[in-house]
């Protein structure tokens, strides 16, 4: 780990974050900032049933391995009004899907470690590099506090830019406008 030679077996990830309640002395303002990075091949294994995945999903992080991401979250409430915002900016290394390069670049936890691209010189984001941006904004009104019934509207923007088409993915931009009525009748999560 300390030689910095990019050995494929140096499998680790890092997470740094900060949560702030009553940020800037503003009542009911919650801020969160987070940085995550995971080296290539971290959750994969040469015995496929020993990887860090289940039900065709990576367990440790949605992006698997071979990525860096920064996350910012803001929640604010004033009386019965609320606003939530979330921004995710990241870079992820995928395998190539053109059929000419069948090596694993370390991002797919279900790929065999023995198919790695190199023993040394592996870096986060190697392979088919994709830039990812996700922005989400939601505004709403708490209609009934007893049942947590909320009227809300939201805007979500996602941008995915791989250098080349990835397995099942190509470059895309999507924007969603949402609105609705929701309730958290069975919200029993109070670990904060």
PLM segments and residue spans:
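Exposed, low-structure sequence patches enriched in small/polar residues
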Residues: 1-192
């Amino acid at each position: 780990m300390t030689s910095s030679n990019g050995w494929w077996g140096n499998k680790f990830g890092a997470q740094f974050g900060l949560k702030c309640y009553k940020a800037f002395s503003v009542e009911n303002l919650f801020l969160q900032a987070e940085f995550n990075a995971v080296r290539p091949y971290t959750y994969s294994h040469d015995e496929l049933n020993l990887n860090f995945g289940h039900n065709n999903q990576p367990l440790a992080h949605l992006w698997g391995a071979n990525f860096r991401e920064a996350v910012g979250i803001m929640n604010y409430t004033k009386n019965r009004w609320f606003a939530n915002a979330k921004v995710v900016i990241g870079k992820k290394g995928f395998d190539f899907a053109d059929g000419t390069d069948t090596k694993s670049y370390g991002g797919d936890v279900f790929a065999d470690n023995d198919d790695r691209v190199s023993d040394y010189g592996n870096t986060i984001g190697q392979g088919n590099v994709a830039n990812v941006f996700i922005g989400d904004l939601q505004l709403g009104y708490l209609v009934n506090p007893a049942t947590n019934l909320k009227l809300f509207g939201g805007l979500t923007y996602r941008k995915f830019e791989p250098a080349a088409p990835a397995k099942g993915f190509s470059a895309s931009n999507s924007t969603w406008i949402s609105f609705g009525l929701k309730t958290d009748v069975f919200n029993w999560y109070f670990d904060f």
